[in-house]
């Protein structure tokens, strides 16, 4: 896996979201750490859009260190998943925390976004 870049989003001088991007063959992995909310969705949305220009087979969002996800963060992921579909790619959320699984499940988006949802819908609950 080749690490491409690392970025952070600051709000009021405080780090809110950090990501690193790595690529392996036709998959791009975006590892998130921190909060995905109204203050951080725009930079992440731009990044995901830029990555889709490379036409990977999969964009995997590694959510293992994502501490918070609100409705704007969910919308960012849904929009990115739709954009990915439009270019023949799949966006999936990998290694989500229990809170991320719960929030996506409540919204009915676990089947759409979670990497293991199709093979085993109870695997992450």
Language-model features and meaning:
Residues 1-68, 78-125:
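STAS-like cytosolic regulatory interaction modules
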């Amino acid at each position: 896996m080749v690490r491409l870049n690392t970025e952070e989003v600051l709000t009021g001088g405080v780090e809110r979201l950090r990501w690193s991007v790595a690529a392996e063959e036709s998959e791009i992995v975006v590892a998130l750490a921190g909060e995905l909310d109204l203050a951080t969705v725009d930079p992440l949305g731009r990044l995901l859009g830029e990555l889709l220009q490379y036409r990977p087979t999969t964009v995997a969002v590694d959510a293992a260190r994502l501490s918070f996800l609100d409705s704007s963060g969910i919308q960012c992921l849904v929009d990115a998943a739709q954009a990915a579909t439009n270019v023949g790619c799949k966006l999936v959320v990998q290694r989500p925390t229990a809170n991320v699984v719960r929030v996506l499940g409540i919204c009915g988006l676990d089947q759409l976004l979670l990497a293991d949802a199709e093979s085993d819908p109870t695997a992450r609950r």
